[in-house]
Amino acid sequence: MSDFYVSLIPTDVNWQPTSKAAAEAEAYVRRVFPDPDGVQQDVTVEFYDRITAVDAGENIQRITCPRCDHDIPLDWYEDLIEQTEGEFDSPNVTVPCCDTAAGLDALKFDWPSGFARFEIAVANPVRGEYEFTADEAGAVAAILGHPLRQVLAHI
């Protein structure tokens, strides 16, 4: 069975909110993503010690280099994630297409993806509109005090 995730991550890969702000954001997300049965979906808040991949999973079909605009082979990215277990000390990698350094957060994914040390996610949302609206994402950003990026994943 497949799982679907809708996540919000900071636009700065190293930024983390306060625990209090994260708890307030979680409470807000639970209100806008109600789960009447209490068993279908799961809301999680994660503070990561290292920069962590938060990608679109099976939705990713194409990655483009921010330096030379050539396609980056998906198997290169999959190998990178496997080798690092999706965790990074540095936000920079050497891309295979032009053998230059690029920021992880600068890689151009066809489905929004990112890298972060904080994530708030809803697994298998049950409401009709499964992603955050612009207003909802903006409200979470205001609670946390930092701009956010939305990631829709199919795992």
Regions from the PLM with identified roles:
Residues 56-61, 88-91:
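Residue-level signal for mature regions of secreted extracellular proteins and peptides
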Residues 45-48, 76-81:
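Short linear interaction motifs
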Residues 63-65, 74:
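Acidic (E/D-rich), amphipathic helical modules within compact regulatory domains
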Residues 65-68, 95-98:
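Short cysteine-rich clusters marking metal-coordination/redox-active sites
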Residues 1-59, 155:
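N-terminal alpha-helical interaction blocks
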Residues 72-75, 105:
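Cys/His-rich zinc-coordinating "finger/knuckle" motifs
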Residues 96-155:
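Domain-exit/linker segments immediately C-terminal to small folded modules
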